Amino acid sequence: MSDTSVNNKRIAKNTLMLYVRMLFLMAVNLYTSRVVLQALGVEDYGVYNAVAGFIAMFSMVSASISGAISRFITFVLGQGDQQKLNKVFSTALIIQIAIAILVVVLVEAFGVWFLNTHMTIPEGRYVAANWVLQLALLTFIFNLWSTPYNASLIAHERMSAFAYIGIFEGSANLGVAFLILASPFDTLIYYVALMCLVALVTRIIYTVYCKRNFSECIFRWVFDRALFKEMFGFAGWNFVGSISGLLREQGINILFNVYFGPAVNAARGLAAQVHTAVGKFSQNFFTAVQPQITKSYASNNIDDSHSLVLRSS
């Protein structure tokens, strides 16, 4: 069997696994939103979407860097240079640590002030809103930590593991939604704390799986200035697209909160769930085929790389 035929079968299998994951998560997330809205109420659900959306604005930096990390890990994997692969992975983790420190400083210095002076929060819910801010920040850091591991998983085309872990995370989120229906504590704080716990457990699973299966996923404190500069240079182009999209989505969310209140945020939060689910249809196929394109190019199989680009368009 030719390499092209094997690659085509792998892409088809990976695409199928990603679509199974997507369909499951789409159904679960839409139902979870309904249960969470019922448990929190319109105002608290709106507060959650507005405050957590404020933290999501900082992901414009991490999103562009994540694309660079994924590209570099996949490219070096295609070259077959194991030593450089570990260097890329370790450099990626150092970059994520630096971003995490920067975001924490910005949120604690600016975010807390903005929340308590400019955002529209119902009377008596400022304490809960501040808890949401801090726990959403912690969840954001957990997600940053897992980015190089996720990139390695996709670069090695282990889409079945990626799908199963995603299904676990979606199921856990649904479990959290049912738990808060009978919460003895402040429902909003309890919900965000449990979501933070789910994020932590999921990231630990990603880390353990990658360390056991991929030799490059062992962190070593190495700093390659040239590689660091190259990764940030590549990320700069992704940053242009990321910042425009995220400012449009999350900036509107904050403006809605300031001028119309949390009830409008609740409605927009539900609409965003549907919009995100639909957008993932094309994204999943691209996720399945991108590693093959990058690895073919890295190994100087330019014709195969061009062929994959044309056939996947």
Each language-model region and where it sits:
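Signature of the first transmembrane helix
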Residues: 10-75, 104-108, 173-174, 233-263
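Residue-level recognition of pore/gate-forming positions within transmembrane alpha-helices
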Residues: 22, 26, 53-56, 91, ...
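Helix-loop junctions and terminal segments of transmembrane helices
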Residues: 63-79, 155, 214-215, 275-313
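Interfacial transmembrane-helix starts/ends
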Residues: 11-12, 49, 83-98, 232, ...
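Hydrophobic alpha-helical transmembrane segments
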Residues: 21, 134, 163-213, 233-234, ...
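Alpha-helical transmembrane segments of polytopic membrane transporters and translocases
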Residues: 46-62, 91-94, 194, 201, ...
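Interhelical loop/hinge segments that connect adjacent transmembrane helices in multipass membrane
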Residues: 1-11, 188-192, 206-250, 288, ...
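Short membrane-interface helical motifs at transmembrane helix boundaries
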Residues: 104-124
